[in-house]
């Protein structure tokens, strides 16, 4: 049976062998007919685990997903590969839904995608009772657990299937973010024996994780986006206001930027999302509302401009980078005042127990920002992996920046804060240290302080950056409230007493992630033109990974093209000639 599965994989998807865990998951549902849980990292190929069995079984596989935007992309990709599939959701007209339900009754589809809310429809359950449903795949299965970071009560509707379908289908639950408690809950809710779990770990070896502390965020984002101007990326923020601010800044810098958050109209969000998927926008600035169901495989970087609320959210959002397996970066820009933003959002909850749980998770997120250990290892241990190895490539593992003693400068700043009675914010303190003639500085008599102008060889901006560094290393703390004031921590007072020294590493450079060759860029243009004609996102035609391999191997005929990962029979027949022509034209030009 596995031989047939491999043959289908090559024919439809263009891959010669399964990735880790895929063959075991397929065996459990097709041969053993066991309800199965798949815990695999984002980009680990979870969808193949149910798409191949769907092709092997008679009847229609039902796929339950909360991600409306993902449904269309996945169905487009399946149809591009020559597989009959459809979806229904709330974005469609009654006529469209009626036609697709008729197709479902007639057995026209191998896979049929729905949201969990659809299971409350008596009419829909009756249709399922009248057709052959061999397999039900439940994507984003962590949504069924009250212990998960994204619990959705609608997922409890899945219980209806167990009650109402006489011929019990095999259940497959899939997730990329499940702590041990969430895993237990998934198995309990979906009648899965824990030993029937395919677990390939959470490690994403193609992702490089970094935490940037004590740096000017705006400058870092500007330089990073400029250095990676040919790559797609997402900048996440905790609030709509910050998303709007960064978006406007990038637009002023001539960046092809979009924005996405709950304060925008539905049609605006949809238009921005489609432009990003179609490579018309380089960068999307967004709150956590964006990304659930984004199957764009060539996102090369994810920057978090503010700390997320918990590790599950962070890993899920960061994990949208590099889904095609190519090298990508996930950078978290840490600033202590961002903790207060998340605390405020958490404290809006009326449930005391949930508040306590969420504050504990936020504390773990802050620990991640301060750890000097391997960042990938910290994440894996959070998700329950025992003694994972250091990744050797994250910002902490590869940090060779020289550290300079800045104790004297730190004492100047700390002394100034105390002399200002610890009643003012960062900008005012920086202005006093720089010797500013600002009206407020003079009115408050700060020009008479011994620390006035003591750092006049630096700009107010440079001093503000240095204060940010002292805050991030807990020498200075900030009060709560809309206009936070600075006060010296006990650690900072030890510096003033001469009992503790302060060392600062050189600023982290915003470097380019990868260098792309000319042929790869030409193949990307061919792909973009085809995608525009077909009305699908470019990655649905071929992934960046497939184009990279084409660029490296430069196939000259159909057989050689079929040996490239991601080129199946259908796509070879449909697009092969255009890509081979471009490769041949490039070869002639460079001879």
From Swiss-Prot:
Gene Ontology BP terms: DNA recombination; DNA repair; DNA replication; SOS response
Disruption phenotype: Cells lacking this gene are moderately sensitive to DNA-damaging agents. Sensitivity increases in the presence of mutated AddAB nuclease.
Main location: cytoplasm
Pfam families referenced in this protein's UniProt entry, alphabetically: DEAD (PF00270), Helicase_C (PF00271), HRDC (PF00570), RecQ_Zn_bind (PF16124), RQC (PF09382)
Assigned GO CC terms: bacterial nucleoid; chromosome; cytoplasm; replisome
Occurrences of domain HRDC (ranges): 513-591
Molecular function in Gene Ontology: 3'-5' DNA helicase activity; ATP binding; ATP hydrolysis activity; DNA binding; four-way junction helicase activity; metal ion binding
SMART domains linked to this entry: DEXDc, HELICc, HRDC, RQC
Transmembrane stretches, start-end: none
Domain of life: Bacteria
Keywords on record: ATP-binding, Cytoplasm, DNA damage, DNA recombination, DNA repair, DNA-binding, Helicase, Hydrolase, Isomerase, Metal-binding, Nucleotide-binding, SOS response, Zinc
Helicase ATP-binding domain segment(s): 27-196
Documented EC number(s): 5.6.2.4
Segments carrying motif DEAH box: 139-142
Cofactor, free-text remark: Optimal helicase activity requires 0.8-1.2 Mg(2+) per ATP molecule.
Cellular localization per UniProt: Cytoplasm, Nucleoid
SUPFAM superfamilies reported for this sequence: HRDC-like, P-loop containing nucleoside triphosphate hydrolases, Winged helix' DNA-binding domain
Transmembrane helix among keywords: no
Record's function text: An ATP-dependent DNA helicase which unwinds DNA in a 3'-5' direction. Requires between 2 and 5 single-stranded nucleotides on the 3'-end to initiate unwinding, is not active on blunt-ended DNA. Can target DNA replication, repair, and recombination intermediates; is active on forked, gapped and 3'-overhang DNA as well as 5'-flaps, Kappa joints, synthetic replication forks, and Holliday junctions. Prefers ATP over dATP, is not active with other nucleotides. Only unwinds short partial duplexes in vitro; SsbA enhances its activity on longer substrates.
Family statement: Belongs to the helicase family. RecQ subfamily.
Summary of subunit composition and partner proteins: Monomeric. Colocalizes with DNA pol III subunit gamma/tau (dnaX). Interacts with the 6 C-terminal residues of SSB (ssbA).
Protein name as annotated: ATP-dependent DNA helicase RecQ
Record organism: Bacillus subtilis (strain 168)
Phylogenetic classification of the source organism: Bacteria, Bacillati, Bacillota, Bacilli, Bacillales
Gene that encodes it: recQ
């Amino acid at each position: 049976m596995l031989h047939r599965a491999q043959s289908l994989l090559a024919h439809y998807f263009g891959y010669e062998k399964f990735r880790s865990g895929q063959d075991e998951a397929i065996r459990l549902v097709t041969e053993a007919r066991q309800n199965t849980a798949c815990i695999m990292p984002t980009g680990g190929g979870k969808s193949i685990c149910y798409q191949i069995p769907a092709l092997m079984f008679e009847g229609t596989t039902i796929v339950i997903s909360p991600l409306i935007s993902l449904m269309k992309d996945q169905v487009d990709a399946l149809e591009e590969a020559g597989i009959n599939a459809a979806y229904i959701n709330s974005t469609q007209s009654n006529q469209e839904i009626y036609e697709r339900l008729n197709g479902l009754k007639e057995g026209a589809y191998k896979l049929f995608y729905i949201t969990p809310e659809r299971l409350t429809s008596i009419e829909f359950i009756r249709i399922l009772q009248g057709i052959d449903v061999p397999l039900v795949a439940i994507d984003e299965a962590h949504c069924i657990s009250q212990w998960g970071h994204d619990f959705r009560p609608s997922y409890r509707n899945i219980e209806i299937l167990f009650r109402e379908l006489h011929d019990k289908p095999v259940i497959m639950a899939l997730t990329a973010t499940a702590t041990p408690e969430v895993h237990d809950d998934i198995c309990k809710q979906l009648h899965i024996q824990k030993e029937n779990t395919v677990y390939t770990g959470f490690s994403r070896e193609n992702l490089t994780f970094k935490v940037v502390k004590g740096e000017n965020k705006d400058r870092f984002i500007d330089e990073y986006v400029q250095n990676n101007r040919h790559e797609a990326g997402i900048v996440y923020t905790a609030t709509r206001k910050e998303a709007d601010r960064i978006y406007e800044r990038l637009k002023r810098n001539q960046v092809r930027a979009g924005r996405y958050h709950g304060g925008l109209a539905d049609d605006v969000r949809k238009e921005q999302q489609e432009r990003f998927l179609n490579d018309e926008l380089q960068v999307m600035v967004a709150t956590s509302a964006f990304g659930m169901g984004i199957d764009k495989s060539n996102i090369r970087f994810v920057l978090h401009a503010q700390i997320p609320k918990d590790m599950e959210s962070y890993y899920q959002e960061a994990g949208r980078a590099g889904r095609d397996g190519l090298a990508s970066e996930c950078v978290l820009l840490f600033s202590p005042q961002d903790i207060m933003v998340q605390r405020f959002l958490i404290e809006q909850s009326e449930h005391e127990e949930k508040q306590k749980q969420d504050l504990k998770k936020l504390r773990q997120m802050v620990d991640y920002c301060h750890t000097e250990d391997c960042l990938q290892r910290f994440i894996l241990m959070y998700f329950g992996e025992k003694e994972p190895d250091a990744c050797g490539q994250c910002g902490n593992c590869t940090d060779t920046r020289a550290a300079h003693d800045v104790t004297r400068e730190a004492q100047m700043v700390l002394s100034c804060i105390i002399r200002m009675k610890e009643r003012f914010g960062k900008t005012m303190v920086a202005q006093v240290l720089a010797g500013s003639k600002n009206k407020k500085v003079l009115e408050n008599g700060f020009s008479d302080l011994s620390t006035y102008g003591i750092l006049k060889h630096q700009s107010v901006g440079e001093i503000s950056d240095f204060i940010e560094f002292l805050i991030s290393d807990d020498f200075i703390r900030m009060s709560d409230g809309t206009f936070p004031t600075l006060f010296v921590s006990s650690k900072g007072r030890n510096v003033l007493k001469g009992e503790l020294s302060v060392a600062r590493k050189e600023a982290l450079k915003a470097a380019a992630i990868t260098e792309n060759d000319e042929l790869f860029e030409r193949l990307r243009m061919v792909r973009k033109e085809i995608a525009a004609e077909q009305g699908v996102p470019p990655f649905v035609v071929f992934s960046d990974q497939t184009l990279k391999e084409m660029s490296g191997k430069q196939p000259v005929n159909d057989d050689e093209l079929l040996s490239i990962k991601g080129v199946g029979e259908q796509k070879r027949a449909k697009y092969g000639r255009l890509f081979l022509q471009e490769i041949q034209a490039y070869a002639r030009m460079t001879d």
